[in-house]
Amino acid sequence: GYGRAKKNDLTGSVTAIKPDELSKGITNNASDMLVGKVAGVDVQTAGGTPGAGAQIRIRGGASLSASNDPLYVIDGLPIDNNTANGMSNILAMINPNDIESFTVLKDASATAIYGSRASNGVIIITTKKGRKNQGVKVSYNGDVTVSTIQKKYDVLNAAEYKELVNSISGLDASSLGNADTDWQSEIFRTSISTNHSVSLTGGLKNMPYRVSVGFNDANGIVKTSWMHRGNVSANLAPSFLNDHLNFNIAAKYMYEEDRYADASGAIDGALSMDPTHPVYITGADARYTGGYYQTLINKDDKSPIADKTWAKVPNSNAPKNPVALLNQKHIGARSNDYSGNVEMDYKIHGFEDLHIHASLGAQHTESTQKDDNANESFSDNYFGWHGITKYRKYNIVGNAYLEYGHKFGAHDIDIMAGAEQSHYHRSGYSEGQGTDQITGVANSPTLRSESAWTTHNSLVSYLSRLNYTLLDRYLLTVSFRADGSSRFSKGKKWGYFPAAALAWKINNEPFMKNITWIDELKLRLGWGKTGQQNGIDDFYYMPLYVRSNSYAQYPFGDTYHYTNRPSNYNKDLTWEKTTSYNAGLDFTALNGRFGFNVDGYYRETTDLLATVPVPAGTVPGDLQLQNIGSLKNYGLELAFDVKPIVTKDFTWDVTYNVGWNHNEITELSAGYADYVDTGSSISRGNGTVIQRNKVGKPVNSYFVYQQVYDENGKPIEGQFVDRNADGKIDLSDGYYYKSPAPDVIMGLTTKFLYKNWDLSASFHASLGNYVYYDFLSNRAQISANGLFSNSAWRNSTPEAVELGWTALGTYGNINYRSDYFVQNASYLKCSNITLGYTFGPLVKYTHTPHCSGRVFFTVQNPFIITKYKGLDPEVADGIDKNPYPRPMSFQLGLSLNI
C-alpha cells in the first residue's frame, strides 16, 4: 500500500493474482474470483441470492464481535464496509470484467501501514487501464446462465405423512386434505440470467484511457427473486511536463435494483406445510387469504379489525403457505453508488528522486427499500403493511505524502512520509404501518414504526515507511502509522501501529551464481501491529439520549409521541490491538515452471471488544460493550504453481494452496460469567443460542450436551452423559464441542491448453468445520404434539421419523442441544469446469484483422463431496437455518475483441 514494489522485493506476506479468464468460472461479483485462489483466505459466498456477497476471512478472525472483514482498497480508495439496503455486496460497485488484479496483504508487516483498518488483512483491487500510444480496442463479454437447484430437502409426501399421522395415537386425521403437494417444487424454479459488458480502451500520446459499461440481469432459483445491476467505469491516466506530473483518475457508478424473496421464510414454509393440502383454495375462506390455503382460526372478539364481516384470520402458530409468502410479500430495493479517486504524482524537476504524491477519493451510496405485505397476507392479515427504508452514506478520504528513492552504489533506499484524513457519514430513515380497510387509518398508533438517525466518524492518520536494500540481497522494511479516531474518549483516541520486516534473496548470493535453474529463493521475517475500531458506535464513549422505538410511545390526548431514553455507553473503550509474527519462504525455478510459497504465522489480539452482562444500575440496560480479553491465531500456509507439461501445442498448469489455522481465546473477562453467548439463534427454544466464547476454546464454539447412543449407534432420546456425576442432567453438564471455523482450507485449479482449446477445473475444500443441523432439530419431534400443535399440522422428514424422538422440550430443552445435531461439515466442492475455444481474427478491415475472441461453456457447482446430511455444508455462521440454496449453473459465454 501507498506505493508500488516489485514482487521479488516484497518483505511481507503478500499474494498478487490476476483473474484467470480460462478458469474464473461464473463471476457475478468480485469476491467470486477469490474462491480457493489464495492460501489462508477463506471465501464463503452468502448463499444463492442474486447479487449476494461473501464472507471473506484472512487467516481466521482477529475479533469476537467487531468486524472480521478485510479492508478493501479499490484503485487507491479505501472502502467503508457498511452496506446499504439493497446492496448486500460491498464489491458490487465493480464489474468483474474490469478487474486487472488482486493483491492480498496478509501479515501485519505488510498491513500495518493501513493502521486501525487492517487487523483482518487488506485486499487491494486494481482495475484495468489503457496504455500510452495504444490503439483503440473495443471488447465485449457476454454470457447466458441457466441455474437450477442442486438438492432438495427430504420431507414426507402426502402418503407418507398420512401413514405417520395414522400411526400416532391422539391424532385425528380427518382434517387432512386429499392433495399431494410438493411445496419445494412450488417455490423453486429453473432461472435464466444474462450478463453483458463492453469496454473501450486506448491511449493517446499522454492520455491512456479505458471506459466500460456492464449490465447483469440475474434471476434467482427461488421464485420472485431477481437483481438488475448496471456498472459504468472510467479510468484516465494523463501525464504532463515530460511525464513528471502524472494522474490516475478512476470513476465508477453502480445502479442496482432488487426483488428479494423471503427465501428463509418460504423455505421453512415449504418444509413445514402439510403436504395433503393444495396451494390454492376457493370458497368463502379464500377472501381472508387471497385464494391461498392457510390454516385459519376465528377472529378474536377483541380484534381491532373494523370490518365485522372479516370473520377469520391465519393461525399465527401454523406454518405459512410459502407460495403466498413469495407472492403477497414484496420487498424491493434500489441503490446507487458513486465512487471516484484522483491520484497525483509529481516528480520534482531537477530532483527526480523526490516525488510528491496526493490523492482525494470519495464514495456516495444511497438506497431505498420498500416492504409491502398484502391485506390477505399471513403476517399482516387484513391491515397489510407498507414500509419504506432509506439509507445514505458518503465517505471522503484524502492523503498526501513525500517519497524519496535513490540508489547509492550497493544501497537502495526508499523513504515516504505523509498524512491522511478520512470522514464517514451515514444516515437513514424508516417508517411503516398497516391500514384498516374500512376506516383507512393505522391499525394501532403504537404499531406505527418510524425512525430517523444520522451518525459520522473521522480518522486522522500520520504514516511513514522505509525500504532499504543492500546488494540486491538484503532487504529491510520499517513502517509506522498513528491513527486518531473520533470514536474514543479523550486520552484514548490515538493508536500506534509499527511494523518491521527482513528478507534475504538467497538466490542473489555469490555462492548461488552457478545454480542457474533457481529463479528465486527468498526468506522473509516480519512483525507488526494493527488495530480495530469497527463494531463500536460512533458516540458510544459518551452518554446520550436517543429516541425510543414505536412500542415506547406515550399518548397525549389522541396523539402518540415518541419518548427519549438514555443510551448505553462506555467511556473507557479503547482499540483492539493485533500483533502478528510471520516467517516465509518464496521459491521459483525452471523459468517459472515450478514455484511455491510457504508461510508460518502467529498473531494475538488484545483488548477484544464484546458485549457482556453488567450489574444492574451501572449503565442503562444490562449489557455493555467492553474490552474484555485476548485471542490468538496461528497457522501454516503453502501454495504451489506447477507447469508439469509445456510443449508447442500442449500445456498443463496446476495451482494448489492449503492453509491450516487454529484460533483460541486466551483471556476473557465476561462480567459475572466466564463465557459470552454468541451466534445466531436456532429455530427451537425461542431465541436459544448454542454458541459460546470461553477461555481455552475456539471462537463461537458450540455449547451442547453429550449424546448417549445405543449399541447400533442410534441416539437415545433424553439420554446424555452426566459429565459432573451429580446424578442429574442440567446446564452444568454442557460442554464445548467443535466450532464453525475450518481447521484446513484448500484450493486447486488445473488447466489444460491444446492449441486453441482450453479445459479447466477449480476446486475448493474445507476440513474440520462443524455445522448445527437446524433443519433436523426443528423437526425431530415425532409425536402428537410435534405434528399437530396449536391447531396446526406440521410436516416432518424421514430422518426424523427414523430418529423417533417424541419430545424436544420435555427434558428441559436439552434434546435440541444434543451434540448429535452438531455435524462434521467438511467438504470438497468443484467450483467450476470450463471448456473454451479461442479463435483468431474473423474479418479484415483496412488490412487490419478484427474480431478475435473466445467462446466457452462453464458448469458451476457441478458436485460436492461431503458427509454432512444437510442441503449445503458451506454455512458461514455454523447454524444451518433455511439458507437460500446455491444453485448449479450452466453458462455459455463469448469474449470478443473488435
Task: Describe each model-derived feature in a short phrase.
Residues S739-Y772:
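Glycine-rich, aromatic-lined ligand/substrate-binding cores of catalytic
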Residues E21-L22, D69, K162-E163, S169, ...:
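Extracellular/periplasmic, surface-exposed regions of secreted and cell-surface proteins
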Residues L171-S174, Q184, N317, V323, ...:
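Extracytoplasmic gating/loop element in the C-terminal half of outer-membrane beta-barrel translocons
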